[in-house]
């Protein structure tokens, strides 16, 4: 997967793993449950990928969540990024969409997923922040465009999206069946 030209460069992937959403249920800590699945909260700048049945939950404003799912293996993951791309920023973390999606693809690959079996769902990107100086584009719009671009270049079909607008969203994505629930706030 590392040499697949359809995917973002793995060199953008950070070496640290402290951006992982903590799965409290895996450590035996009591946790909320959604439709029989332990809930894992994915905070801004975090991501998760798992072979376990989990309900990944997050809140989105201008941020975007890219959810990927492999239906054959019934595994999936979610990113929650704040800004579209790192643009050479020295702090290369999944707060940036280009890094977040590349790391999620890499982690899912390590769990056995294959890019040709993946399906994507994209959420968020509301217009709740001011425009970028100079180009007049809004953060949410740029986040949406980046998600569509990366997923499109990887030839991963987008099976659902709820993006844009002027309201935030509460999102729950089930990693074992690829289903998602969205509520606008």
Question: What is each residue range found by the language model?
Answer:
Residues 1-185:
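Active-site microenvironment for binding and transforming phosphate-containing groups
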């Amino acid at each position: 997967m590392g040499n697949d030209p359809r995917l973002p460069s793995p060199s953008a992937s950070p070496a640290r793993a402290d951006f992982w959403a903590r799965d409290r249920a895996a450590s035996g800590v009591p946790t909320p449950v959604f439709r029989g699945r332990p809930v894992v909260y994915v905070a801004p700048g975090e991501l998760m990928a798992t072979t376990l049945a989990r309900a990944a939950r997050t809140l989105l404003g201008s941020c975007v969540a890219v959810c990927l799912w492999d239906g054959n293996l019934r595994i999936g993951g979610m990113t929650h990024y704040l800004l579209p791309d790192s643009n050479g920023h020295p702090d290369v973390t999944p707060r940036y969409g280009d890094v977040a999606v590349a790391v999620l693809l890499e982690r899912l690959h390590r769990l056995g997923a294959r890019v040709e079996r993946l399906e994507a769902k994209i959420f968020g990107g509301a217009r709740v922040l001011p425009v970028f100086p100079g180009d007049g584009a809004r953060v949410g719009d740029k986040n949406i465009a980046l998600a569509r671009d990366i997923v499109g270049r990887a030839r991963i079909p987008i099976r659902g999206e709820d993006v844009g607008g002027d309201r935030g969203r509460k999102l729950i994505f089930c990693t074992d069946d690829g289903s998602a629930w969205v509520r606008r706030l």
